[in-house]
Amino acid sequence: KITTIIVTHDSYEAFYLGHKCAIILDGQIKQFDDPYNVYHFPNSVEVVNFLNRGILIPAKVTGENSLENDDLGTINGNFIKHYPKGSNVQLLLQPEDLEHDDKSNLKLEVVDRKFRGTNFIYTLKTSSDLLIPVFVHSHHEHQHEADEKFGIKRPIHIDHIVCF
């Protein structure tokens, strides 16, 4: 075994190469963990912003395993940190958290679509002008263009809900 320290500003590179990752901001270690946990369980808004792998949207805790967002409705899942019912939080929404469904009644406007090989990343706009990134497998036959409506599967379920 050889211990190696790699310094990079590319989180994909860090996740791919590292057994452990340290997020260092302003000379302080903000999070030190394995890459999976750094990505799925960031411990602060600073880490979320540094990774730039999702957005924070306003939500209200409505139950032990649910919260509500004005644009997306009810979101169910498993909270990483529990908050009292009625708490206003910032929900981390990552591109893989929402699923596309052409038949859904929850429709968002397509602002942009980028091809990334195995998937497309769509940028969707909500009724309150939030811009939400969503991954869709590139084999999906119906590709949406800008200004088209894009269905989001309901109920929305996120395996691990991260809030601040």
Regions found by a protein language model. Give the residues of each.
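Internal alpha/beta loop-helix hairpins
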Residues: 2-73
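Non-catalytic connector elements of ABC transporters
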Residues: 54, 64-164
